[in-house]
């Protein structure tokens, strides 16, 4: 969101529009990634290319990418959360003058470690073929773009939670004060009708964005580069549940007066 979209203009409609646009980004990046097989050598630790580095080639490329992006201010945005936050270089770009819209505890909520684990161990085997054909740098670039898009979508739960809290603070406050009532918070946050609409929409987008275009009018069936049902499953089993997890974590800390500033 642009600076002018924050604070008094923040609304569920504005956030919903952003989440819908983010669906496009995730699907297009997913289509790019599945052009390649898993290429498992990329993720093996330690990498044989860097004797003094204990991580994988993928981790090395990802950390270097985040370090460069940090220098130019990517992680000054409340919408962005690094996968490797330790020892990131300071930004040479001055921070935005936008007023803060989230509670300061938002900075402490980062589930990218969980997202990365799910991506490597569940999503890649689900979407990509089991082979190793090289092209490691290009494959990693696709991984990084897709992971950052998924992370942004999931951590947008902080904004969703903030707006819901502002709109219905009388409902959320007792549950937050109870602290342990995570199930009640999750129930209050869940709208099954909306989730079904999201699953259907992303499946339709995957079918449209990923269809193989042909000049033959009598083609018997449309071939898709990515299975629409798998994209729907991606949202159903991972993206939406993890987004709600972020919302719950944010709300449980929303009343922390010790860290509360003008919002």
From Swiss-Prot:
Its main location: cytoplasm. It is found in: Cytoplasm, Cytosol. Keywords: Amino-acid biosynthesis, Aromatic amino acid biosynthesis, Cytoplasm, Isomerase. InterPro entries: Chorismate_II_sf (IPR036263), Chorismate_mutase_AroQ_euk (IPR008238), CM_AroQ_sf_eucaryotic (IPR037039), CM_II_prokaryot (IPR002701). Its EC number is 5.4.99.5. Homodimer. This is Chorismate mutase 2. It comes from Petunia hybrida. The gene is CM2.
């Amino acid at each position: 969101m642009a600076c002018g979209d924050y604070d008094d203009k923040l609304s569920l409609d504005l956030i919903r529009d952003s989440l819908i646009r983010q669906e496009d980004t995730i699907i297009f990046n997913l289509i790019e990634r599945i052009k390649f097989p898993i290429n498992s050598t990329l993720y093996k630790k330690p990498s044989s290319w860097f004797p003094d580095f204990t991580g994988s080639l993928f981790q090395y490329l990802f950390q270097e990418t985040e370090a460069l992006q940090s220098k130019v201010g990517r992680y000054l945005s409340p919408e962005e959360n690094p996968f490797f936050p330790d020892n990131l270089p300071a930004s040479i770009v001055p921070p935005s003058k936008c007023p803060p819209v989230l509670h300061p505890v938002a900075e402490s909520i980062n589930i990218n470690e969980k997202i990365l684990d799910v991506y490597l161990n569940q999503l890649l085997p689900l979407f990509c073929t089991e082979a190793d054909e090289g092209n490691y740098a290009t494959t990693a670039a696709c991984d990084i773009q897709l992971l950052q898009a998924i992370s942004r979508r999931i951590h947008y739960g902080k904004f969703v939670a903030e707006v819901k809290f502002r709109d219905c603070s009388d409902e959320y406050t007792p549950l937050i004060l109870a602290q342990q009532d995570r199930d009640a918070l999750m129930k209050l946050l869940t709208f099954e009708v909306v989730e079904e609409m999201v699953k259907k929409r992303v499946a339709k987008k995957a079918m449209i964005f990923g269809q193989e275009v042909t000049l033959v009018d009598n083609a018997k069936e449309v071939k898709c580069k990515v299975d629409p049902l798998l994209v729907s499953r991606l949202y159903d089993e991972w993206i939406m549940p993890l987004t709600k997890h972020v919302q719950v974590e944010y709300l449980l800390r929303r009343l922390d007066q010790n860290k509360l500033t003008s919002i």
